[in-house]
């Protein structure tokens, strides 16, 4: 089976080894359960906004369809102060594209919420309350769009905020999640995927 992961630095697993990224951990968990999965195909780059992911997707050739697709994008829209309306439109376009790539089965698409980098050391000296509020605004949009199109939704944001008091959830760069935090995400995704496979 094939799994496509779309996103940004959080999907790549910035600052952790590739096999500790959440898409690779998802596949490892499912393989341990006896499901045959190819290595995940990751289309993501550090710093990407929704428009940059869209632009890249229109320029590359992918498989006709995938058994599962995940989508986690938006932190760089927030960081670069891009308008919410722009995010709404582009995220919905990305989700529709994700559903098409999942053989038009929205139940095979998993939207992951944006983690809150406002709790990380990287945010020191910034208005962390404002960052958290803006992340919540972006997540309200991606959740409502996911539900509208009947895709799965996983809210990892509350867990990401535990990094405020648990630095084991952060990578050495003081910004991105650690392998431990990605493992928590991977468990949630693997549960959703296994539920689909069991039908």
Please give the residue ranges for each predicted region.
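Short N-terminal helix/helix-N-cap motif within the alpha/beta-hydrolase-1
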Residues: 14-15, 51, 80
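Residue-level detector of flexible, active-site-proximal loop/helix-junction positions
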Residues: 10, 47-49, 116, 160
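Alpha-helical cap/lid subdomain in secreted, periplasmic
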Residues: 55-199
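Acidic/histidine-rich helix-loop elements
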Residues: 15, 41-47, 85, 126, ...
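Serine-esterase "nucleophile elbow" of acetyl-processing enzymes
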Residues: 1-46, 56-64
């Amino acid at each position: 089976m094939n799994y496509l992961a779309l996103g940004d630095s959080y999907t790549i697993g910035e600052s952790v080894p590739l096999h500790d990224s959440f898409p690779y951990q998802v596949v490892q968990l499912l393989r341990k359960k006896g499901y045959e999965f190819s290595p995940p195909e990751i289309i993501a780059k550090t710093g990407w906004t929704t428009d940059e992911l869209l632009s890249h997707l229109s320029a590359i050739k992918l498989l006709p369809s995938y058994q599962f697709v995940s989508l986690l994008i938006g932190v760089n829209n927030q960081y670069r102060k891009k308008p919410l309306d722009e995010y709404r439109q582009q995220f919905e376009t990305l989700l529709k594209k994700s559903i098409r790539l999942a053989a038009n089965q929205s139940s095979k698409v998993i939207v992951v919420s944006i983690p809150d980098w406002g709790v990380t050391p990287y945010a020191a000296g910034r208005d962390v309350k404002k960052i958290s509020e803006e992340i919540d605004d972006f997540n309200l949009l991606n959740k409502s769009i996911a539900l509208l199109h009947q895709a799965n939704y996983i809210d990892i944001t509350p867990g990401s905020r535990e990094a405020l008091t648990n630095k084991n959830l952060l990578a050495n760069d003081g910004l991105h999640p650690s392998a431990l935090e990605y493992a928590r995400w991977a468990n949630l995704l693997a549960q959703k995927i296994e539920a689909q496979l069991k039908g």
